[in-house]
A protein has these predicted regions:
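Membrane-interfacial amphipathic helices and adjacent loop/beta segments
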Residues: 1-8
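Non-catalytic C-terminal accessory region of glycerolipid acyltransferases
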Residues: 8-133
Length: 133
């Protein structure tokens, strides 16, 4: 594995790898900075979603899978699933909604093991209070 930083140089390395037909992995459910995300639906809640994957697919036209590792008594169960076909849409909203639906499908396999500390809803406010207060 070749880990790269989550900055412009890292994105450049990912793009180069994809253009060479190499496999890459991105954690798609991180809460992105405002400049790197757009509002989309995640578990029926409107929240910010990273746009990087949509942009990479638009440039490279690569295949996409979603993966997860679920801890079991004697190790791990690894799952690979197809991503909703709309992830390939040129419409960014359709693509991001497809990404989030695919993440939801993986989370539903075992919600207790999802990394909820990613705080996907931290930009939400309810009656002036932040979602995680």
């Amino acid at each position: 594995a070749n880990l790269v930083p989550a900055d412009i140089k890292g994105v450049s390395n990912v793009l180069k790898a994809l253009t060479k037909g190499e496999a890459t992995g991105i954690l798609p459910d991180q809460f992105p900075p405002e400049i790197s995300g757009q509002t989309s639906t995640f578990f029926n809640v409107r929240t910010r979603t990273m746009t990087l994957i949509h942009k990479l697919i638009g440039r490279v036209k690569c295949n996409t899978l979603i993966a997860s590792a679920i801890r079991v008594v004697d190790g791990w169960e690894i799952y690979f699933q197809r991503v909703d076909d709309d992830i390939n849409s040129t419409d960014i909203s359709a693509s991001l909604n497809a990404l989030n639906r695919s993440i939801e499908d993986i989370v539903k396999l075992n919600p207790s093991q999802y990394q909820w500390e990613y705080k996907r809803f931290k930009d939400l406010k309810d009656n002036g209070k932040k979602f995680y207060d």
